[in-house]
Amino acid sequence: MIKMKALIFMTILMLASTGCGKTEQEPLRVYSFSGENEQLTVFNGIIVFNGSEEIFSGGDLKAADDSFLDITSYSTTFYTISGSEKNVILSNSVADMTGGTVNVSGDLGQISGDSTLRRIKIDDTNDLNGTLYFELTTKDKHGTENVYQLQMALTEITKNDGN
């Protein structure tokens, strides 16, 4: 009987404490980003802020010319620049170990979780405007390394109307 009363008391205490300090949930905010130059295009990039859950999807990469046909390895990196500090958001690498080549065009991957962007002091896309970059580093069959950089342009998809 005493165990039952203790269990009921603990349950009531836990239920009461979970309601205390409840804050209003942040509204869903969705942004798209893209960037391009003569050689590369990044498109369909998405950033989602949904309370503490954040999603960063790099979108797709399209190589515009034949200079990317002899690539044996490459890495892609999304990052922000704050002062002289480079803060990596998402980075992926691909290498062919058979002596062949790899295609740089395609899906750039994604990352999600609690504080995916806030861990690098990003609370809003205002912190990303003008500071979000994409970098492609390639190595060809002759061992020549090239680095390509694009600045991303952000567009808000959802409008925050306070509801």
Segments predicted by a language model, with ranges:
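Short coil/turn motifs at secondary-structure junctions
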Residues: 81-83, 139-141, 157
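Short, solvent-exposed, Trp/other aromatic-anchored flexible loops in extracytoplasmic proteins
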Residues: 91-142
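C-terminal motif of bacterial Sec signal peptides marking the signal peptidase cleavage site
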Residues: 16-19
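Short beta-strand elements
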Residues: 144-163
